[in-house]
Amino acid sequence: MRFQGFWLCLGLLFISVNAEFMDDSVEMEDFDENSEETDELSSEIKYKTPQPVGEVYFTETFDSGRLAGWVLSKAKKDDIDAEISIYDGRWEIEELKENRIPGDRGLVLKSRAKHHAISAVLAKPFIFADKPLVVQYEVNFQDGIDCGGAYIKLLADTDGLNLENFYDKTSYTIMFGPDKCGEDYKLHFIFRHKHPKTGVFEEKHAKPPDVDLKRFFTDRKTHLYTLVMNPDDTFEVLIDQIVVNKGSLLEDVVPPINPPKEIEDPTDEKPDDWDERAKIPDASAVKPEDWDESEPPQIVDSSAVKPDGWLDNEPEFIPDPNAEKPFDWNEDMDGEWEAPHISNPACRIGCGEWSPPMIDNPKYKGIWRPPMIDNPNYQGIWSPRKIPNPDYFEDNHPFLLTSFRALGLELWSMTSDIYFDNFIICSEKEVADRWAADGWGMKILIENANEPSIFKQLMSATEQRPWLWFIYLLTAALPIALIGSFCWPRKVKKKYEDVAFEKLDICKPQTKGALEQEVKEEKAALEKPVDLEEEKKQSDGEIVEKEEEGEPEEKSEEEIEIIEGQEEGNKSNKSGSEDEMKEADESTGSGDGPIKSVRKRRVRKE
């Protein structure tokens, strides 16, 4: 059981490691063709521009190669230098760099470190009423992403909306999509909620997803982002058709939709005599007479002695004798060249002026302070009193947001070649799913077909994780060990199995004179020491002789203990018969007739 449990744990470990490299978020068919077959697959696929099935508010595939209906912004950002305030970032319509499908094009952000703004009007405004909102589009960070976003804005349906003036402060209803800067990976879902009393809009941020978003920014694959808002005030955020975030518009956004009923009174002030001190010095405490505050915390160690070999006149650092002035060193511009300093090899023990080390002063007590006691006048931490919130309201249906009538991308990025494709806004998730299957589904088909084999993925994984070689070797040995354990199981002998219980040897009849002679010889042997080698040979000879007479096999210590236990049991059961044998011996002991004696066979122990 221990053997099988070990390999079971090893198998589970390998599965957990392998899961790190497998995309378990998307359930797609595995393709195991080689590179030639995948090239043929890409050329054989007949791409067809997706067509919406059902009511839609906006669709865009960019397959026509033209930006028909899209408006480039001519606005300028406020509060920044004029040189960088212009939205002069470049957009192009191109196919994907990798895993391209002939005829499938997308909108590509082409400029680095520039502001980009482009927008398009919906076929009809979306009004939040009794139908869900479904927003979906594709993003591919073809060169990865250092710092930048790929989110969209749904621009509010206002009278002053002008797409040529679209900039960062243009009023929007929803902001949705991926964003990254540094190591902060985000998937925004922000909506602007209107205060019913003051009319002021406030941004509400959905809680962050519970999944690691890093791979969606770094794997250079096309990913599908979907937002679903329902009339029951719930929402879902999906990546590649997998829900990564969901919740309630009333409970899972920050700040909350409804303000608190009571707020702190801004006019309330803390009284001057309010005592917030929980502890105060004990006024009745007196400093001890022997308390010396003049002693320093550390003193010179008077017992320290300068180590032998300490060089007082040697510098601790010296110029590097092996250093050479760079060939391009210009003394007029760079100044006089000096060799870098290195540790003085002669200062192995120490160099420079020696001074004894400092140690803690055992007499140090520091400045005396009275002990702290509970404050009898403690009133607690003061806080302003609560008053009814004059701006309080209760909105139990936050889904009813401001309608929108345009979609825009207002982005700044330090990385170029961000690919956008297949925008759709509708009210039915099934319509968006069909749209995704005809567009994004084709891209995933090609990407999976061009994926390297499992073997190549495992080998490439070891470049960053060398410890995986150990897992691979153990995993390779797993089936061999299991087959061996089942085909050639280890034979385990049962305890006491094949133990032969043999009868005690009964010596040949001996005369009384012969017994007396043996007794004399034993006494003589005890009185005269015998050479160890002769004794060993004699004992070996006796054992060999007895083995020839009786049993040819030797018995283990456990078998001897069993035999002795049975002999002791037999003694108690056969006490009557032994008494009779003794009486028979005594009756024949007066003469030289033969007698019988029972002996226990000596067994050599190895």
Curated annotation (Swiss-Prot):
Gene: CLGN
Tagged with keyword Disulfide bond: yes
Compositionally biased residues, Basic and acidic residues: 518-544, 568-579
Region (Disordered): 255-308, 518-606
Cystine pairings recorded for this chain: C147-C181, C347-C351
Protein name, per record: Calmegin
Assembly and interaction partners: Interacts with PPIB and PDILT. Interacts with ADAM2.
Bias (Basic residues): 597-606
GO CC annotation: endoplasmic reticulum membrane; nuclear envelope
Modification sites for N6-acetyllysine: K124
Cytoplasmic side: 488-606
